[in-house]
Amino acid sequence: MINYELLKNRINKSGIKIYALAEACGLTPQRLYNKLNGKNDFRCSEIIYLSKALNLSPEDRNAIFFAQIVD
């Protein structure tokens, strides 16, 4: 399960514009927005591109993209 709130927070803190992130992932901005809002899943390659663009550590990447479901 993806921690969308944490991902959006990291994007905002990075100062990188959505269109630039989308381009880095080979997506349209609308497609990236859909993924950020849980309408579509991220592909492994997109997770890699976003992790690099946002300078995520392996721990941060795992906390965002591989968050565990907690009751």
What annotation goes with each model-predicted range?
Residues Y4-A24:
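Short basic helix-loop element that most often maps to the first helix and adjoining turn
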Residues S45-D60:
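DNA major-groove recognition helix of helix-turn-helix/homeodomain DNA-binding modules
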Residues L27-D41:
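Recognition helix of helix-turn-helix/homeodomain-like DNA-binding domains
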